[in-house]
């Protein structure tokens, strides 16, 4: 419905990763997409597969029809919402809900999603099995607290975060299984 080109987007990622809400947004926008399943949390081989498209070796990676490469879930989702405004997955720059949209997109990405990098592989920050267990416990607690903090600040009554319309953040919340 919103397709501007026949060249598909190429999305690198796996189920449950930051690629999930990007894939949902592309699907809701009816944009052509080729999905390349890659799970960097499964080890060096998988991270190596990402090297050519993302030197940081993380997902999601979205290759635009122009060949340009984008990374970072929030950046991709905001770009898609801005590039395809008719899809209604994010408020227009002049919309009164735009500030909250950007606030919560950034919060989820920086305060919550970033913690999964630690939680998924505690050995990145811990030097012993005991320390890994502590890191895992504390990151899991912090993730839950961030969701509680966000929930406490949500307006009551509207169906979605920004009122009665679906937004990118609603996709993240529902599809990431938080």
Briefly describe each language-model feature range:
Residues 2, 105-178:
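GST-like fold's C-terminal all-alpha helical module
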Residues 2-134:
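GST-like domain detector, emphasizing the conserved glutathione-binding G-site
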């Amino acid at each position: 419905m919103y397709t501007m080109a026949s060249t598909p987007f190429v999305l690198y990622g796996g189920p449950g990763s930051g690629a999930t809400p990007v894939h949902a947004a592309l699907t809701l926008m009816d944009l052509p997409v080729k999905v390349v399943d890659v799970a960097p949390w499964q080890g060096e081989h998988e991270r190596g597969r990402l090297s050519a498209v993302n030197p940081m070796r993380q997902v999601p990676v979205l290759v635009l029809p122009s060949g340009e490469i984008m990374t970072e879930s929030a950046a991709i989702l905001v770009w898609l919402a801005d590039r395809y405004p008719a899809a209604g997955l994010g408020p227009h720059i002049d919309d009164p809900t735009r500030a909250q949209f950007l606030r919560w997109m950034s919060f989820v990405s920086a305060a919550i999603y970033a913690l999964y990098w630690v939680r998924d592989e505690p050995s990145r920050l811990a030097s012993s099995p005991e320390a890994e267990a502590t890191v895992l416990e504390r990151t899991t607690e912090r993730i839950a607290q961030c969701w509680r903090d966000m929930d406490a600040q949500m307006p009551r009554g509207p169906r979605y975060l920004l009122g009665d319309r679906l937004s990118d953040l609603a996709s993240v919340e529902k599809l990431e299984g938080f």
